Amino acid sequence: MALYLILVLMLFGSTLVFYSLSPYYSALGLVVVSISGCIILSFLGGSFVALVLVLVYMGGMLVVFAYSSAISAERFPSVNNLGEVIGLSVLFSSWVFLSFDNFQDFSNSFSCFISGESLVEAGFYMKGFLVLVGVFVLLVVLVGALIISRGIENTVIRAI
């Protein structure tokens, strides 16, 4: 049941990212999604990998958030249709809750698939390729955030 609640929290964070007009609430949604994803990884046995991922992801997201909030800072940040965000989260979580019969069988079936040592060993086996892929993905996200926030008419930098 705890795994289900963490998945609902991840769903709420992702809908907050999709429906927010301001980068402040999008960053909050990304924090919720990343922390809940790392909690799911630690439930499945990868506690070290979860800790490393949350530290790396929060650092990369901090850079993207700093650039996007500097370009498109708003005086009154808002979420577009907050009731719709909460409604979608309640709808999907109740749909999943009613479709599963027993959550105990679901949580016991994934008990030994992921171990932190095997994922770290795979990272060393790839000889830094995964680090380069992560750097490239963060760079693409940064450029995407800058392109999206460039089209806004009334921003702080353009008002100067």
Swiss-Prot record:
GO terms for molecular function: NADH dehydrogenase (ubiquinone) activity. Its EC number is 7.1.1.2. One of its GO terms (cellular component) is mitochondrial membrane. It is found in: Mitochondrion membrane. The keyword Transmembrane applies. Keywords: Electron transport, Membrane, Mitochondrion, NAD, Respiratory chain, Translocase, Transmembrane, Transmembrane helix, Transport, Ubiquinone. InterPro entries: ComplexI_Subunit6, NADH_UbQ/plastoQ_OxRdtase_su6, Nuo/plastoQ_OxRdtase_6_NuoJ. The chain crosses the membrane at residues 1-21, 39-59, 83-103, 128-148. It is a multi-pass membrane protein. The keyword Translocase applies. It catalyses: a ubiquinone + NADH + 5 H(+)(in) = a ubiquinol + NAD(+) + 4 H(+)(out). It holds the Pfam family Oxidored_q3. Its main location: mitochondrion. Gene3D superfamilies: NADH-ubiquinone/plastoquinone oxidoreductase chain 6, subunit NuoJ. It is an enzyme of class 7 (translocase). It comes from the Eukaryota. Core subunit of the mitochondrial membrane respiratory chain NADH dehydrogenase (Complex I) that is believed to belong to the minimal assembly required for catalysis. Complex I functions in the transfer of electrons from NADH to the respiratory chain. The immediate electron acceptor for the enzyme is believed to be ubiquinone. Belongs to the complex I subunit 6 family. This is NADH-ubiquinone oxidoreductase chain 6.
